[in-house]
C-alpha cells in the first residue's frame, strides 16, 4: 500500500528498501537493564528521531506522523493499525542518548551500515568546518543574569524543600522574583538593584546547606562568585572592570544552560556552542557523507581536531587527506596527525603575527638563515647570533638573540626591528620548522590551491545544517542534548543525500550561459571554475 501510494518512494521508505534499516535492537542491548519490563523497540525509536530531524518535526508531530503517515509505518515495519506511542517517549530516548557518548555510537553504527553497503570508505578525502550554535536561552545583562539565577534557585528549592523558604520569602521577594525578569534596555538604578540582588542571593545560599543544594542553587553560587566580591565590611559588591572579569571560557551566561558560553569571532558575537562537521569529498564519489559531528564550547578549532581524528580512527574512516581552514591548523598538528594517524592535513598554517609579516615589509623570520647544527642564526646583513636559548616558558620555540653592537650600527635596522633592543628571532625545532616552510611553499603552488579549493564545499553542508534543518539554534539546554540534536541531524542529512542519489536522475553539469555559448562560438576561452589556484 505504501508503494502504491508513493510510486517514487520517500526518504523514509528508502531506508528500509536499500539498507533494511540502520539499526537493530541488538545494537542497543547495553543501554537497557536485563530485568526491565518490555518496552518499545529502540531501533524504531532511533529511526523516528532521525526522521523527526529530517523533517523538522516537534515531538508531538513526530509521534503523530508515526500514527498517521504510511511511509513512516513502512520505514518502521509497523502494521497499519499500530497506534504508535506517546510523544514523551522521544524525550526519554534522547535522555538515554545523552549518556556515555551514545549519540556518537549511533552515528558510528549508521556509518558501519553505510560502509558495508559500499557508499563510504576509509583513506579517502574529507573536509571539516565549524559554525556557531545559539543556546536555547535569551541573552541576559548582568542584572538579569543574577535575578534569573535567584528565580531558578527559588523554583528548585520550592520543589525540593519548600520549608527552607519559610521566613525568607516575603512580599518584597514575591514582587521581585514572582515572575520572569523583563527589564528595559536602561533599567532604573541598576547598580542599586544589582547590589540588592547580590544580598538576596547570599541570604538564599545561606539558607540552603551544601548537601541540600540542587544544580540550580549551585549555578547561583557560581554566578555570585563570578559577579561579586566581598567588600571591607564583609558585604557583597558587584565586580568592576578594574577587579577583573572571569574569562569567557568559564563564565556562565544563563542559569538554565550552565554549559553555554559567550564568544566573539571577528564581528560575530553569540552565546552557545560550536558545531564541527566532517564529511567526505572524494572526486569519484557520487555523494558526500557526514562522518563526524562534534559539538563543543566556543573554543579554538585546533582543540577539536585531535578528537575528530580519534573518533574517525575508531570508526575506521580516517582520511588520507583532510582539508581544513587555517583555524584548525598548527605546525604541531600537522606533525602529530601524520605521525599518529597517517593523515595529511591540507590547509594554510597561520602566518606570523610580527609587523614585518603583516605589513609585508622589512625582514621576516624567513629572511634569516638558521643553522641547527651550529646553533646559530645569520641575518640578511651577514651577522650571526650570539645567544641560542630554549626557554621552557616558550616551548617548543627556540630563541636566537643578536647583540646590540651588531644591530645598532646596521643601516638595515629600521627594516629589521622597531624596538630599542637588538633583534630576536623565534623559531620551531628543526622537524617542525621544515614542515612549516614546506607548508608555506605549497601555498604558492597552483595544484595545491586547486586541491584546497575543494574545502569550500563543506560550507554548503554547514548551510544545509543551518537553513535546511534549523541547527543554528539549539532545541535543548545543555551541551550533551545539543550534541544529540546535531548527531541526529547529521544522520538525517546522510539518509537524505543517499535517497536523492538513488531516486533521482544522475547529476548533470550546469549548461553554459548564453554569453558563455557566445564565447565558445568565437573561440574565446573562459574559466570553467573561478577557483583555479592562480
Model-derived features with residue positions:
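Basic, low-complexity segments
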Residues: 1-35
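Residue-level detector of alpha-helical secondary structure
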Residues: 14-18, 47, 65
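A short secondary-structure junction motif
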Residues: 22-26, 69, 73, 468
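Trp/Phe/Arg-rich N-terminal binding region typifying the photolyase-homology
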Residues: 30-42, 55-102, 106
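Alpha-helical support elements that line or immediately flank enzyme active sites
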Residues: 44-56, 295
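Anion-binding and metal-coordination hotspots
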Residues: 61, 66, 82-83, 91-534
Amino acid at each position: 500500500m505504501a508503494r502504491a501510494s508513493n510510486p517514487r518512494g520517500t526518504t523514509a521508505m528508502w531506508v528500509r528498501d536499500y539498507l533494511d534499516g540502520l539499526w537493530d535492537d541488538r545494537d542497543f542491548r547495553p543501554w537497557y537493564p536485563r530485568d526491565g519490563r518490555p518496552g518499545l523497540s529502540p531501533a524504531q525509536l532511533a529511526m523516528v528521531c532521525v526522521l523527526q530531524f529530517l523533517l523538522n518535526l516537534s515531538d508531538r508531530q513526530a509521534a503523530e506522523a508515526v500514527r498517521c503517515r504510511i511511509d513512516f509505518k513502512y520505514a518502521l515495519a509497523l502494521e497499519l493499525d499500530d497506534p504508535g506511542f506517546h510523544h514523551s517517549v522521544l524525550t526519554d530516548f534522547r535522555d538515554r542518548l545523552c549518556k556515555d557518548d551514545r549519540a556518537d555510537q549511533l552515528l558510528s553504527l549508521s556509518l558501519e551500515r553505510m560502509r558495508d553497503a559500499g557508499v563510504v570508505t576509509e583513506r579517502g578525502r574529507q573536509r571539516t568546518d565549524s559554525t556557531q550554535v545559539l543556546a536555547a536561552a535569551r541573552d541576559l545583562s548582568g542584572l538579569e543574569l543574577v535575578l534569573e539565577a535567584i528565580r531558578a534557585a527559588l523554583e528548585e528549592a520550592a520543589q525540593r524543600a519548600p520549608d527552607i523558604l519559610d521566613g525568607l520569602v516575603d512580599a518584597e521577594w514575591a514582587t521581585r522574583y514572582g515572575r520572569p525578569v523583563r527589564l528595559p534596555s536602561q533599567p532604573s538604578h541598576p547598580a542599586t538593584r544589582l547590589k540588592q540582588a547580590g544580598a538576596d542571593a547570599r541570604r538564599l545560599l545561606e539558607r540552603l546547606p551544601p548537601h541540600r543544594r540542587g544544580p540550580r542553587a549551585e549555578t547561583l553560587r557560581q554566578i555570585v562568585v563570578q559577579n561579586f566580591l566581598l567588600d571591607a565590611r564583609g558585604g557583597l559588591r558587584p565586580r568592576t572592570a578594574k577587579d577583573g572579569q572571569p574569562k569567557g571560557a568559564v563564565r556562565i551566561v544563563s542559569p538554565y544552560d550552565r554549559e553555554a558560553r559567550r564568544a566573539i569571532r571577528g564581528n560575530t558575537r553569540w552565546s552557545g556552542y560550536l558545531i564541527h562537521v566532517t564529511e567526505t569529498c572524494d572526486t569519484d564519489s557520487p555523494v558526500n557523507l557526514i562522518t563526524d559531528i562534534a559539538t563543543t564550547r566556543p573554543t579554538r578549532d585546533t582543540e577539536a581536531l585531535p578528537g575528530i581524528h580519534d573518533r574517525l580512527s575508531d570508526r575506521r574512516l580516517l582520511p588520507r587527506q583532510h582539508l581544513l581552514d587555517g583555524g584548525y591548523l598548527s605546525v604541531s598538528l600537522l606533525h602529530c596527525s601524520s605521525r599518529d594517524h597517517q593523515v595529511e592535513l591540507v590547509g594554510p598554517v597561520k602566518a606570523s603575527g610580527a609587523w614585518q609579516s603583516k605589513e609585508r615589509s622589512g625582514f621576516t623570520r624567513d629572511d634569516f638563515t638558521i643553522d641547527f647544527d651550529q646553533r646559530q642564526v645569520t641575518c640578511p646583513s651577514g651577522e650571526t647570533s650570539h645567544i641560542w636559548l630554549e626557554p621552557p616558558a616558550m616551548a617548543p620555540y627556540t630563541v636566537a638573540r643578536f647583540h646590540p653592537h651588531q644591530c645598532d650600527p646596521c643601516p638595515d635596522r629600521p627594516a629589521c626591528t622597531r624596538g630599542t633592543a637588538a633583534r630576536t628571532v623565534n623559531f620551531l625545532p628543526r622537524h617542525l620548522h621544515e614542515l612549516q616552510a614546506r607548508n608555506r611553499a605549497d601555498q604558492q603552488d597552483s595544484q595545491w590551491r586547486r586541491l584546497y579549493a575543494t574545502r569550500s564545499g563543506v560550507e554548503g553542508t554547514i548551510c544545509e545544517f543551518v537553513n535546511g534543518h534549523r541547527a543554528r539554534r539549539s532545541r535543548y539546554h545543555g551541551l550533551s542534548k545539543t550534541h544529540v540534536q546535531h548527531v541526529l541531524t547529521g544522520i538525517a542529512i546522510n539518509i537524505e543525500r543517499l535517497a536523492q542519489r538513488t531516486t533521482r536522475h544522475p547529476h548533470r553539469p550546469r549548461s553554459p550561459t548564453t554569453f558563455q555559448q557566445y564565447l565558445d562560438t568565437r573561440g574565446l576561452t573562459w574559466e570553467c571554475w573561478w577557483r583555479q589556484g592562480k
